[in-house]
Amino acid sequence: MGSDLTHLEGRPPQRWQWRVFVLAALLSATFAFFTHTCSSPLPQRCRPYLPNVFNKHSLQHNEPEVRDALLAVDSFVRQSFHENPEIDGLVAAVVTANGAIYETALGPLKANETRPEDRGAVDRYSIFRLASGSKLFAMLEILILRERGALQLDDPIAKYLPQFAHKHGGWANEDDIDEGPITIRHLASHMSGMTREYPRGNMDHWPHSLEGIGPPPMNGAPFPDTLEETVLGISHYPLNLPTSTYPVYSNAGMALLGQIAVVANAAAERSQGVDVAR
């Protein structure tokens, strides 16, 4: 009997051995699970559409909170107009799904006219040049399409415009440049390295002459009428800067961004059975 006790001395009872084994197994399984979870790519999240609350429940201008807010908007618009003489005229509106709940028009329609009676007045039908304000709409459409899963910001341009190509080269440290693809994110942030306009003008006489400066057709080059002409124009010239190094304002890049939105939206609607040809 004594020899049996000596043999078991320093060892835990058998039931404790079983518990230690189970605990070790649980710890190993837990460690393996978290290791796999952390090392595996995160699954793509389903991104639901934003709730269309204001389409179904439109704001009413006679509601006290809305009325107070609109009065504050009107005060801000008028004060800003009178404090900024460089603004000739403006039209501002707050529009809901059921129409405008606030409108104001300030300033002359033709501020450069000599005779005051010829200047007219701005109203809701006055036409203003949208210019680079259109970039906001292009970017908003890109963000909406990303939310719907129709595109990703790091998608290369060639995924949506297969004919797109560009030239690298012309820099002092050319061998150190990463010649990766230009992506949607690069276009949206003006980090593509593209110049402002394509095609470029002929500036052989610079600095003695500014001939050839500016966008087409003012630079002497024909204005690109089609997407193909814009894309081909880009492929004929090297980038101003390597991609992702420094922001360069590019109207051409934004034009491509808008076309990508058109292509991505059409593909998304086609996958849902929408007749995009209508």
Swiss-Prot record:
Pfam families: Beta-lactamase
Membrane found in the keyword field: yes
Cell compartment(s), UniProt: Membrane
InterPro entries: Beta-lactam-related, Beta-lactam/transpept-like, Beta-lactamase-like_AB/R
Membrane-spanning intervals of the chain: 20-37
Top EC class of this enzyme: hydrolase
Keyword Aminoacyl-tRNA synthetase part of the UniProt annotation: no
PANTHER family reported for this sequence: BETA-LACTAMASE-LIKE 1-RELATED (PTHR22935:SF95), PENICILLIN-BINDING PROTEIN (PTHR22935)
Record protein name field: Beta-lactamase-like protein str5
